């Protein structure tokens, strides 16, 4: 059996789940509206994302069209095995409209091992709270979940709550499974920065250490804090926001 193609597809499916749990994709089901004022812009969010310079040598940025959240074809088959998490992922895999400031990135190591995804979304504080609460509840409810990458291969992962980096209050889980004897491991976490939500995913094969995942998570958190002028876990809006447009008096 040739492993790289199905392994990469399964990795993409698993990390698509991480992005789909982010508030950008939960917001995709919301009623369309105008871009919110007083929130960071998509450009400001993009500047806060990890780059190849942040994660270390050997990584390359995946083309935007190959992003795990680029559309339904990027996640060709639903996940199953945990109703709350599966329903949340399968219901919210669409790309949100322009009224939702967002940015995301996929960084691949050699041969797609490891893979890192990060998405940032800005939205109203109350809506963000509801979206992150839903994602956290879904993560906590799972013990196993199965990913099918659209090939003949599927993997059932055990799901274990973990702490990523130094953020003990941030919801995160570890996923462990095997495919044809190859060990697969992933970490998925969500984080809040005032009115910005982050979804983080890390996938590796033939390895189970959490050290690199935590290192990349710390790097992601630190960069968002620096770029947006905010603190992880805070409900205070970032200092980096779009200018408020004032109407003309008549």
Give, region by region, the residue ranges found by the protein language model.
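Second-shell loop/turn segments in exported
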Residues: 39-41, 115-123, 203-210
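A small/polar (G/S/T-enriched), proline-flanked helix-loop surface module common
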Residues: 66-179, 239-240
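Long, compositionally biased interface segments
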Residues: 204-250
